[in-house]
Amino acid sequence: MDALFRFKHFSVRNTDSALKVGTDAVLLGTVMSIPGHCSRALDIGTGTGVIALIAAQRTEDFREPCHITGIDIDSASAQEAASNFALSPWSDRLQAQCVPLQEFSPGMEFDHIFSNPPYYDRSLRSSELRVSRARHSDTLDFDSLLSHSRSLLAPQGILSLIIPCEIVSDLRRRAASYGLYPFRLVKIRTTDRKFPKRAVVEFSTERVELDTEELTMTRDGVWTPEYSHYVDDFYLKKT
């Protein structure tokens, strides 16, 4: 089996990280907003580093360079992300650290924070502890994620997350208690025959009207134009 997940402009080694490259990560990386003024970004739970790499590609034409830090609690994941970063065209703007968010003290604020967070709460555990820690919210619950993200955000910064649709309302309620308010919600369905199961939700520190969208990935087995708009610059070929 090929150990590399190949994109158009970079490849991701996918062997040591606790969680592998998946649809959720690519969706977040391609769908999330990236502020045009973004000079510092933080990827929480970076895994293989794929979301940070997508963000690096999306910001390569920014007037000011956007430096992206990926952190992960799992040492093998952080090491693999660092290797993937080093082999990418944007190695000078990417770094990985093995550190829990709760202990991360960078001495700076970030214009953009993004995460594909663990959201399984006390559900069936994987037999491998590393995978279980990456998938379950015990080691990084939403309150910790929101409170630490809020403290690390620059005044005009944004937080982008991908989560199951059924927990969006609860997350919005929790976020408000930390002074974070949603400005964009993208509900995502895999096909036009299914209900949305994932959502990209984005927060800022300002109360604004919520922009709600729906994204359908495929129709009759073919990528929809709106999905292609997001992923064409990244995937090698359509599936």
What are these regions (language model features)?
Residues 2-40, 46-58, 202, 216:
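SAM-dependent Rossmann-like transferase core, predominantly class I methyltransferases
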Residues 9, 65, 91-93, 156, ...:
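A generic structural signal for alpha->beta connector loops
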Residues 13, 69, 95-97, 183-186:
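General small-molecule cofactor/ligand-binding pocket signal
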Residues 17, 21, 139-196:
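Conserved Class I SAM-dependent methyltransferase catalytic core
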Residues 28, 116, 145, 203:
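Residue-level signal for inorganic ion chemistry
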Residues 30-115, 121-127:
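Conserved SAM/SAH cofactor-binding pocket of Class I
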Residues 117-144:
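Mobile active-site "lid"/loop adjacent to the S-adenosyl-L-methionine
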Residues 195-239:
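SAM/dcSAM-binding transferase cores
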